[in-house]
Structures are given as C-alpha cells and as structure tokens.
Swiss-Prot record:
Protein name, UniProt field: AA9 family lytic polysaccharide monooxygenase H
Cofactor note: Binds 1 copper ion per subunit.
Record-annotated CBM1 domain positions: 272-307
Residue span of region Disordered: 228-272
EC code: 1.14.99.56
Coiled coil: none
Native organism: Podospora anserina (strain S / ATCC MYA-4624 / DSM 980 / FGSC 10383)
Pfam families per UniProt: AA9, CBM_1
Molecular-function annotations in GO: cellulose binding; metal ion binding; monooxygenase activity
Keywords, sorted A to Z: Carbohydrate metabolism, Cellulose degradation, Copper, Disulfide bond, Glycoprotein, Metal-binding, Monooxygenase, Oxidoreductase, Polysaccharide degradation, Secreted, Signal
Length: 370
C-alpha cells in the first residue's frame, strides 16, 4: 500500500511534457512521425547526462524523414504525455503553466536521419525564444495549444539533419541541478538552395554548464511573479544562425492542418494493419485498429499504440524506464500556480514491486494504464 501511495503521489505531481509532432508550413506531419520520443515525460536535470542530445530511453520512433523547405514555418507540438492530455480537462496539458522557460531548436547534419546515432554530433542553433515583455516561450506554446513555431533559416544547406527541440522549465531553477530540460529529436531533410552549413557549433552534452545564469536562476520577483525580477533573461547556448536579412525571433502561429494520408507502399498483403509504433486506438480515433505486427497497447483513454511487446512487458518497460534513477524528484504545489518545494522520495525498495503491480492491472482500472 505504501508503494502504491508513493507512485500515485509521483504521478499526481507530474506536470511534464513530450515533443511528439512536427508541422511544416501549417501541415501536421502526424503523431510521432519522424520524432524520436520516450515513453516517459520526465525531464533531464543533469546537463552532462550522456543522453542530453535527444533524451533517454527512446522507444517510439519510425523511419520517417520529414521534408522541410529552407525558410519554412515549422511547428513542434508538445503534449503532457504520449498522445496529448492525460484526461479530459487536463490542467497540465501541454505542460503545467508554472513551468516557465525558453524553447530552443538545434540542427545536426547527418548522413541518414532515419537511423543516425546521436553521439559525437555537432549542433548549431537555428531558433530560440525566451522572455519577451513578461511572456515566456512556454506561455506562447501553451496559448498555441502545444505548438511552438519558428522559421527555419532560409540559408540552411540542404541535406539530412536531426532537429533537436528543447524546452527548459525554470520553476525550480534557483537550486543548482534543479532546472528541468525536456528535449526530443525529429528526423528531417532540409530542401532548397541554401549554402550555410551552420556556425557556433556545440556538443551535447557539453554545451551547457549547471551554473549558467540562464540555468541557475530564480525567475520570481518579490511578489512571486515569474518576471525574472524585471531583468533580461539570458538563454543558454550559442547564438542562433542568422541569414542576410535577419529572422523573426517570435513568429506568429498559423493554422495547422493534418497531412494527407500516405498511400500504402507495400506490406503483408492485407494492407489494413497500423504500422508498428503507430496509433491503433483511443477515444475519437478513426484510423486502423488491426495490427500488422505487435500488440495494441492502451497508453490512456485517448491513445493506444502498437508495441512489439506484450501488454505486461510494455507497461513494465514504461514504468521502469520512466525514472532510471531510484530517487524520484517530486514537486509539491504549495502556492497558486507555482511549485516552490521539492521532495525526494526514495522508491528503491518498491520500484520493481510497484511496476509489476501496475503492469498486471487491466487498462480500465485506475493506475493500470500509466
């Protein structure tokens, strides 16, 4: 019972987010299409974490490479968990409003974005948005229904890239090592006639230090408002790439429509099954529900996904990979809209037991589908 209480408490204060969709010039490219996403929405807090480039425990990916014309308006969509909201009227979708901070976009040139590794890459920044007239980039993303928009520089040279989108939540950043980094990578191909191959290159990990003034910072003024005390906010990392003529640091949102359904390009002859790791169910879903391979696993009431694992194994993997470090950082909401106090709960004794407990529950029982 104690283990159940600990896991329930951790889940109840999870106000995190996952980048999981891309739009190009207003066209939604599809859920998890070309995006390498983890099951877990937990952040990385160690700037020297070996998986700081594209996140850890990546389980959801396909071979899609998204074509992005140089100069295009690009959108990155964030959701509280895979599929979006954790339930109806989820107050923390796409992320808790208290998680103020900047959003940045980096590119790394690769030979084949579909299967490129993330170690040893050289990254250059193409867009950033921080604090502007009291409004944070995260505020704009929430107002846009989870979409963060930026303009891909028109001078970027064509080719395959990994596109790293990073959200930095600063609500607890007054403590060293407590700033929360959320990042995922998309697989893209830049098209056009640009010739700029990047500048101000950095490595991940290695680009940031824990005591950078944009990472170790109290963003609250004396009245508890997240204004950074009226001071300019310094975004970590290098300056973004600029082309002649400049760029728009705060692009306005544009309507996003769904991409046309691609035609089948082969398969097992039936052609009706959803692809591995594709959506196969959920409230309001109208696509295929049969499985070409794998098992349709309910992530929540609104989203089911094809997994090569059994229901039990899939949920065990989700649970165990959600926080590889046994002590779990739990933020307690003590004030209106802000999280001022953090607790560390040691779940080492109960981690495996509770994962088994939750994994054997059917998905229609509360707690059975994490």
């Amino acid at each position: 019972m104690k283990a159940f209480t600990l896991v329930s408490l951790a889940a109840s204060v999870s106000a995190h987010s996952i980048f999981q969709k891309v739009s190009v010039n207003g066209v939604d490219q599809g859920q998890l299409k070309g995006v390498r996403a983890p099951y877990s929405n937990f952040p990385i807090e160690n700037v020297n974490h070996p998986d700081f480039a594209c996140n850890t425990n990546i389980q959801l990916r396909d071979n899609t490479v998204i074509k992005v014309p140089a100069g295009a308006r690009v959108g990155a969509w964030w959701g509280h968990e895979i599929g979006g909201a954790a339930g109806p009227n989820d107050p923390d979708h796409p992320i808790a409003a208290s998680h103020k901070g900047p959003i940045q976009v980096y590119l790394a040139k690769v030979n084949n974005a579909a299967n490129a590794g993330t170690s040893g890459l050289q990254w250059f920044k193409v867009a950033e948005q921080g604090l502007n007239n009291g409004v944070w980039a995260v505020d704009n993303m929430i107002s846009n229904g989870g979409w963060h928009y930026f303009d891909m520089p028109s001078c970027v040279a064509p080719g395959h890239y990994l596109m790293r989108v990073e959200l930095l939540a600063l609500h607890s950043a007054s403590v060293r090592g407590a700033a929360q980094f959320y990042m995922e990578c998309a697989q893209i191909e830049i098209t056009g006639s640009g010739t700029n191959t990047g500048s101000n290159f950095v490595s991940f990990p290695g680009a940031y230090t824990a005591d950078h003034p944009g990472i170790l910072v109290s963003i609250y003024d004396l009245q508890g408002r997240p204004t950074n005390g009226g001071r300019p906010y310094t975004i970590p990392g290098p300056a973004p790439l600029t082309c002649s003529g400049g760029s728009n640091p705060n692009p306005q949102p544009q309507p996003t429509s769904a991409a046309p359904n691609p035609q089948p390009t082969g398969g097992n002859g039936g052609g009706a099954g959803a692809p591995l790791y594709g959506q196969c169910g959920g409230q309001g879903y109208t696509g295929p529900t049969t499985c070409a391979q794998g098992t349709c696993v309910a992530s929540n009431q609104w989203y089911s996904m094809l997994s090569p694992l059994s229901f039990f194994a899939s949920h065990m993997l989700t649970c165990l990979s959600s926080r590889p470090v046994p002590p779990i950082n739990v933020s307690m909401r003590l004030g209106k809209g802000h999280e001022h106090e953090r607790r560390r709960i040691n779940t080492n004794k109960h981690l495996i037991f509770t994962c088994i407990y939750f994994s054997i529950l059917p998905p229609d029982i509360p707690g059975g589908s994490t």
